[in-house]
Amino acid sequence: MEEPQSDPSIEPPLSQETFSDLWKLLPENNVLSPLPSQAVDDLMLSPDDLAQWLTEDPGPDEAPRMSEAAPPMAPTPAAPTPAAPAPAPSWPLSSSVPSQKTYHGSYGFRLGFLHSGTAKSVTCTYSPDLNKMFCQLAKTCPVQLWVDSTPPPGSRVRAMAIYKQSQHMTEVVRRCPHHERCSDSDGLAPPQHLIRVEGNLRVEYSDDRNTFRHSVVVPYEPPEVGSDCTTIHYNYMCNSSCMGGMNRRPILTIITLEDSSGNLLGRNSFEVRVCACPGRDRRTEEENFRKKGEPCHQLPPGSTKRALPNNTSSSPQPKKKPLDGEYFTLQIRGRERFEMFRELNEALELKDAQAGKEPAGSRAHSSHLKSKKGQSTSRHKKFMFKTEGPDSD
């Protein structure tokens, strides 16, 4: 059966158009061309045209048109440069070192301390030999103020801590970071201050703007009736061994008497150690101080050799004790005890005779005792004989 031939006059449906017909529908300057089209070139502005367009004043007809245009985009701000890391915090250095020299002044200002021992239970003790106070953390440390005459009205007493060693004197003494964060403030003292005053509402805590040093100031009060001195109770709020704080560096407390204008009237100082067992530490340091303070032989001026001791003998000569020439009679019960005491006495007599300490009168007596000893020992002596065997010659 033959298939019916298609009529050429009948157009195929749209989906059946050929590729050539679709290609003819594309524009001549298509996007696949490797060269930019002329229309795109017309839209591009040269740098000269752009500068001229920006410098020309808009005409009356173009002004409304430009106002209707959208505002230009604001330039994107440049990314901020990262800030340099902050330097590590360091201890502030003071521009001056307070003097620690004792100055009694015209008012005879001096310090006093209560007498206390070296027991383990003591919380604060003072060593006169070392001029040093040993105390526990945040415990009461009474300091007595003595004067010969009353200072002028408005006088003040200032307490300041400095490091004792010269290589640390310029550093400001302050608490360690751990104790600064502790909630032990009384509402008056800044957390970084080491020294506080106990039981005085008129206390002032000062931070010097020039030297950055911390100090605590209280008004001077004359002694009460029946008392010869004024007592101030101080507290030390950080241990001497705290890392980040004093760090085992010795400190001095300087107490100054000032007038209302800040002029110095008197000065005194003492060393302080804040520790867990003040009595034990004081006893140890005093023993070491006494060992170091033993008298040594001084060298003559201009001599480079070590001075020899006056006594050149290698060993000290024993002191001769006078012997007692009296004789005593001792009654002893029992033969065994008598023999034991007699042998002990003979041994002592023999020792004295060998050392040459026995007087001449007692030597005859000792020889008589030796003869008696020989007789007594022969009584109990057993003679040993060699047994002759068959092989002996």
Curated annotation (Swiss-Prot):
The modification N6-acetyllysine is found at residues 120, 305, 321, 373, 381-382. It is found in: Cytoplasm; Nucleus; Nucleus, PML body; Endoplasmic reticulum. Residues 325-356 are annotated as: Oligomerization. Residues 1-83 are annotated as: Interaction with HRMT1L2. Forms homodimers and homotetramers. Binds DNA as a homotetramer. Interacts with AXIN1. Probably part of a complex consisting of TP53, HIPK2 and AXIN1. Interacts with histone acetyltransferases EP300 and methyltransferases HRMT1L2 and CARM1, and recruits them to promoters. Interacts (via C-terminus) with TAF1; when TAF1 is part of the TFIID complex. Interacts with ING4; this interaction may be indirect. Found in a complex with CABLES1 and TP73. Interacts with HIPK1, HIPK2, and TP53INP1. Interacts with WWOX. Interacts with USP7 and SYVN1. Interacts with HSP90AB1. Residues 319-360 are annotated as: Interaction with HIPK2. The keyword Hydrolase does not apply. Its cofactor is Zn(2+). Residues 283-295 have a biased composition (Basic and acidic residues). Residues 256-294 are annotated as: Interaction with E4F1. It comes from the Eukaryota. Zn(2+) binds at residues 176, 179, 238, 242. The record marks 120 as: Interaction with DNA. This is Cellular tumor antigen p53. Residues 1-320 are annotated as: Interaction with CCAR2. The modification Omega-N-methylarginine is found at residue 333. One of its GO terms (cellular component) is cytoplasm. Phosphorylation on Ser residues mediates transcriptional activation. Phosphorylation at Ser-9 by HIPK4 increases repression activity on BIRC5 promoter. Phosphorylated on Thr-18 by VRK1, which may prevent the interaction with MDM2. Phosphorylated on Ser-20 by CHEK2 in response to DNA damage, which prevents ubiquitination by MDM2. Phosphorylated on Ser-20 by PLK3 in response to reactive oxygen species (ROS), promoting p53/TP53-mediated apoptosis. Phosphorylated on Thr-55 by TAF1 which promotes MDM2-mediated TP53 degradation. The keyword Endoplasmic reticulum applies. PROSITE patterns: P53 (PS00348). SUPFAM superfamilies: p53 tetramerization domain, p53-like transcription factors. One of its GO terms (molecular function) is ATP-dependent DNA/DNA annealing activity. The modification N6-methyllysine is found at residues 370, 372, 382. A motif (Nuclear export signal) lies at residues 339-350. Residues 365-384 have a biased composition (Basic residues). The gene is TP53. The N-terminal and C-terminal disordered regions undergo liquid-liquid phase separation (LLPS) following homotetramerization and activation. Post-translational modifications, such as phosphorylation or lactylation affect the ability to undergo LLPS. The nuclear export signal acts as a transcriptional repression domain. The TADI and TADII motifs (residues 17 to 25 and 48 to 56) correspond both to 9aaTAD motifs which are transactivation domains present in a large number of yeast and animal transcription factors.
